[in-house]
């Protein structure tokens, strides 16, 4: 009859284990007649051991996310054209050396078309598509990282 394998806990301080402080499990395997014993050390699976093994992967993922948010940040020019418009008049301040911005002309024409504000349906599709695009990019990044971690040899 074969003797069962003895599993020691990670805190075991018996003479066979001499626990060194690292989370390991000693497994004794008795082969055949039980005269020969092989001792193997296997690492316990815990959240901290997985985090320690893949710490560089989490750091890379965090850097990629930071880079993504920095790149997707809107660019603001320091030189701009300012205009003010109400029902009684229109005023425009131009920055020195800057021609009239076509966006200002488009805004004036838009005001003439919608004097009480823009049509809310005008930019709805654009904002939805933009939000979905950013969400899809983050979802794709998460899926790629999960596939890499799960299928890591």
UniProtKB/Swiss-Prot annotation:
Keywords per UniProt: Host cell junction, Host cytoplasm, Host cytoskeleton, Host endoplasmic reticulum, Host membrane, Membrane, Phosphoprotein, Transmembrane, Transmembrane helix, Transport, Viral movement protein
Membrane-spanning ranges: 51-71, 128-148
Main location: host cell
Record topology, Cytoplasmic segments: 1-50, 149-153
Protein's GO biological process: transport of virus in host, cell to cell
Keyword Membrane: yes
Any matching Pfam family: Viral_Beta_CD
GO cellular component assignments: host cell endoplasmic reticulum membrane; host cell plasmodesma; host cytoskeleton; membrane
Domain remarks: The 2nd transmembrane domain is involved in plasmodesmata targeting.
Subunit and partners: Interacts with movement proteins TGB1 and TGB2. TGB1-TGB3-TGB2 complex formation is enhanced by ATP hydrolysis.
Protein family per UniProt: Belongs to the virgaviridae TGB3 movement protein family.
Functional summary from the UniProt entry: Participates in the transport of viral genome to neighboring plant cells directly through plasmodesmata, without any budding. TGBp2 and TGBp3 are necessary for intracellular delivery of TGBp1-containing vRNPs to plasmodesmata. Can gate plasmodesmata and increase their size exclusion limit. Induces host actin cytoskeleton network thickening, which probably plays a major role in virus cell-to-cell movement.
Protein name: Movement protein TGB3
The species this protein was found in: Peanut clump virus (isolate 87/TGTA2)
Lineage: Viruses, Riboviria, Orthornavirae, Kitrinoviricota, Alsuviricetes
């Amino acid at each position: 009859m074969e003797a069962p394998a003895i599993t020691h806990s990670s805190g075991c301080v018996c003479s066979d284990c001499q626990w060194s402080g690292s989370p390991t499990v000693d497994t004794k395997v008795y082969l055949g007649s039980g005269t020969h014993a092989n001792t193997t050390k296997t690492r316990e699976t815990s959240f901290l051991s997985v985090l320690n093994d893949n710490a560089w992967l989490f750091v890379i993922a965090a850097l990629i996310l930071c880079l993504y948010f920095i790149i997707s940040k809107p660019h603001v020019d320091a030189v701009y054209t300012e205009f003010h418009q109400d029902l009684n008049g229109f005023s425009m301040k131009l920055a020195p050396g800057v021609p009239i911005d076509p966006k200002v002309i488009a805004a004036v024409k838009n005001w003439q078309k919608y004097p009480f504000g823009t049509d809310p349906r005008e930019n709805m599709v654009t904002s939805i598509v933009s939000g979905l695009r950013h969400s899809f990019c983050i979802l794709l990044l998460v899926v790629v990282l999960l596939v890499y971690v799960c299928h890591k040899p």
